[in-house]
Amino acid sequence: MSDLSGRTTVVAGASRGLGRGIARAFAEAGAPVVAVARTGPALAELATTSANIRTEVADAADATVAWSLLDRYEPEVLILVAGASPVMRPLQHQTRETFSVNWHTDVKIAFTWLGNALLKRGAQ
């Protein structure tokens, strides 16, 4: 990965899996990383892996969280991997309700964060 020194990066959904890996990779490349997730202990452990990682325990689906963190950190890079954990079963066994929880949560997070990021940029 190229040098990302000084390129503040917010990773929503950073406590595990892909989000955690992305946060670590960006921090190793020199980016100041703000790792956001609902899981405090997992974020605390992540922060011990790099001095470039600071954490925010918060729900990425909350619109006030998105606006507040975008305003506070003014990231150049925004990575959204937060979302609802899906009910794992074959599609033909999903109900509208089980499918909708994931879809609504994931779309809401993307819409909220990207909308706020674009509004903030447009206001400058």
Residue spans for each PLM region:
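Flexible N-terminal pre-Rossmann segment of NAD(P)-dependent oxidoreductases
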Residues: M1-V10
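Conserved Rossmann-fold cofactor-binding substructure of NAD(P)-dependent oxidoreductases
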Residues: A61-E74
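Catalytic Tyr-X3-Lys loop
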Residues: Q92-T112
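Rossmann-fold cofactor-recognition segment
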Residues: T49-A63
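Conserved glycine-rich Rossmann-like NAD(P)H-binding loop of the short-chain dehydrogenase/reductase
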Residues: A29-E45
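Amphipathic alpha-helical dimer-interface segment in Rossmann-like NAD(P)H-dependent oxidoreductases
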Residues: D71, T105-Q124
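Conserved glycine-rich cofactor-binding loop
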Residues: T8, S15-R16
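Conserved NAD(P)H cofactor-binding loop of Rossmann-fold oxidoreductase domains
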Residues: V81-M88
